[in-house]
């Protein structure tokens, strides 16, 4: 490793990762290994980015598609920690506001599907593409006719990416689950309580 002297350290990684990996346990009074291990972590997300060769001008910038069993789906995600066969989706079409974000005549999208974090044991290496295809079929049947044949670029993010690329424990998309004892003041603060000059700014929202 390399030792770097600094007056201020800014971490954009997840709070739990930052404290457990960058600050030795002897220097932590509040965010101990025991507390981090016992914390409850938020759901994760399956994110599909895609571009199309045609425009869908009747689709707004933001669309939420709520499935038929929303409450039960939340139980699947947070309590049972299973990947359900149905989903509720958020569809983002930025080209509705700025057409320059895609080539002329095309559209850009991403769609988010809430899924359980990695404690679920879901084999995302095997399940990612079938899950993407299920979302594709649903969008084609509800909002985006002819979607399959219109796609020109496609990329997915799974909970594995949240863990490995964004350094989020358990692949959680929103760090600690916002239960009462982990909400507001009880969440990690942007200015660390553990060490002067340690500023932890979490892109997925600590506060």
What name fits each language-model region?
Residues 16-21, 103-138:
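Conserved FAD/dinucleotide-binding core of flavoprotein oxidoreductases
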Residues 10, 50, 111, 135, ...:
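Hydrophobic, well-ordered secondary-structure elements that form the walls
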Residues 140-144:
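C-terminal substrate/ligand-recognition segments
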Residues 45-47, 106-108, 148:
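Extracellular structured ligand-interaction cores
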Residues 69, 96, 116, 156-158:
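Residues that form or immediately flank small-molecule/cofactor binding pockets and catalytic motifs
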Residues 1-103:
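Mid-domain catalytic core of redox enzymes
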Residues 84-90, 145-207:
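A glycine-rich dinucleotide-binding beta-alpha-beta segment and adjacent secondary-structure elements
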Residues 40, 99-106, 195-202:
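Short glycine/proline-enriched loop/turn "hinge" motifs that connect secondary-structure elements
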